[in-house]
Amino acid sequence: MKQLQILLAVLFLSNAAFAAEGQHLFILSGQSNMGGLKPEESFIPTVEKEFGKENVIVVKDAHGGQPIRRWYKKWKSAKGEAFKGAGDLYVRLMGKVNAAIKGQKIQTVSFSWMQGERDAREKHSAVYAASLQGILDQLAADLGRKDINFVIGRLSDFDMQNKRYPHWTAIRKIQVDFADASPRGAWVDTDDLNDGKNRRGKDISNDLHYSAKGYVEFGRRLAVSSIALIKGKKVSAGDK
């Protein structure tokens, strides 16, 4: 009994120490495949198991079928064309983030991003990397931090021949290169998540969207990679 009391005391003190240092903020955003992710299925349980429920804040805001210009305020096409209303979804996202962190001390910030399908279809790969950096710069400025970790969900193997989405493989490569180039970045593989049965019970194979089980695994992979980065470990997509 005494040993149990000591163990409980140690666990309590550990959690109290985490709380004193601040909350771990996880921001999830993107288009439809982020929209299909239910954080409560695997992402939240994974990060709460690692850091404690009381030390975690998770904010998700996604919108299906949208290009990256709706998050990046200064987006321009390769021809220099601007987009009216650029960044409106980022503003919506930050509205949720600011409400969630009001009065909280934030220890770490992790950004999970699943997007790129629309830009692949519209052939905007030439400005995709700059747009990713632009979003991270916006987050850094708005949150007053230079230590934001990020995890990118790489586009799946849906259109490896670039038939329907001409820049599909180009954006896949950009996502990998962008994450690999940063000590605070990681990417997760989604090639095995779009087969099986979707949430409506329909059989799918190499689909644009993920299976019901695929979304659960996707959330877990994002969480595992986020945790590793918080601990200062550089992870690869193979670390599933």
Language model features by range: what are they?
Residues K2, F18-A19:
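Intrinsically disordered, low-complexity Ser/Thr/Pro-rich regulatory regions
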Residues K2-A9:
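Sec-dependent signal peptide recognition
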Residues A20-K240:
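Cell-envelope and extracellular/periplasmic
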